[in-house]
Regions:
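Serine residues within intrinsically disordered or low-complexity segments
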Residues: 3-4
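Anion-binding (especially nucleotide phosphate/pyrophosphate-binding) glycine-rich loop
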Residues: 7-156, 162-164
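Phosphate/pyrophosphate- and phosphate-bearing ligand-binding catalytic cores of soluble enzymes
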Residues: 19-21, 27-33, 72, 168-274
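Solvent-exposed residues in well-ordered beta-strands and their adjoining turns
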Residues: 44, 87, 161, 199-203, ...
Length: 276
């Protein structure tokens, strides 16, 4: 954090968390917009998260938790509360058995960096998530996906801080209610849980055969390819569509495909023909 800002500390038991005041939120959004946060802190652990929420609750201050800020557009007036940035790290292989590898990942890990790491060691299951901006915690919140893969397909469980009970809980995949770009954390109980970490299960060996025309065109007629090859193809396509948020402010692709009831399909098709 910027040491030039005035600061104080949140204290809970023997835990001491540094709090910054009047932090420019443009530095915490890939859109590079927004005013100041009245309070700002970075959480490196579950204890940090608990400390921050306890401090805020004692003072009646709202808390907004973020990852890398790729799914938020701040108001020009800023945020009149505590912005808590989740930077919890960790990448631990828990088990390897019968071609399946379970990995626990900290919520603050950058998603693309984790995907790169898993493909380097020959694992498959997340390579199509390459270059999606944000953290692994955010990917659970959003059920990030693309080119035939979603976080829900590899997720085993989520460790989270429950802001109501003030306890750390473990939620199995089914309890997360992951859907198309949706989850329990985003849609049903927004703000209740802070994702601390997640456990995923990946596979060894070649990547699954893709059916996406753009990827097939890049990969040729290979029936099987490595996860690294598929990652490279996905990156090439994404780079052709969107600029790097570090160079040009943007938040990636945030549009979702419409979900239609069966009776509405023919109407949609007739309307689409008008534009062909």
């Amino acid at each position: 954090m910027d040491s030039s800002n005035s600061h104080s500390y949140a204290v809970k038991g023997d835990k001491r968390l540094q709090l910054e005041q009047d932090v420019d939120l443009r530095d915490h959004s890939t859109m590079r917009v927004g005013g100041p946060a009245k309070w700002f802190a970075e959480a490196n652990s579950a204890a940090d998260v608990e400390c921050a929420y306890a401090w805020a609750a004692e003072r009646g201050i709202p808390v907004y938790t973020i990852g890398s800020g790729s799914n938020v557009i701040w108001s020009d007036t800023g945020y009149a509360g505590l912005v808590l940035k989740n930077i919890i790290r960790g990448f631990q292989i828990l088990s390897e058995q019968d071609g399946q590898v379970a990995i626990r990942i900290g919520a603050g890990e950058i998603l693309d960096e984790v995907v790169a790491r898993t493909t380097r060691i020959g694992l498959t299951g997340m390579e199509c998530l390459s270059l999606i901006p944000g953290t692994c915690g955010g990917s659970v919140y959003q059920n990030s996906g693309g080119y035939g893969q979603e976080v829900s397909q590899v997720l085993q469980s989520v460790d989270a801080f429950d802001t109501i009970s003030c306890k750390v809980v473990v939620l199995e995949t089914e309890a997360c209610n992951l859907g198309y770009r949706s989850s329990r954390f985003k849609n049903e109980e927004p703000g209740r849980y802070v994702v601390l970490g997640l456990t995923v299960k990946l596979q060894t060996g070649p990547a699954n055969r893709t059916t996406y025309p753009a990827l097939l065109a890049m990969l040729g007629d290979r029936s099987r390819c490595s996860s690294a090859d598929l990652r490279a193809a996905v990156i090439s396509i994404r780079e052709s569509k969107l600029p790097d948020p570090a160079l040009v402010p943007n938040c990636g692709s945030f549009f979702t495909n419409p979900i239609l009831r069966a009776r509405d399909v023919n109407v949609a098709l007739r309307l689409s023909l008008i534009h062909i």
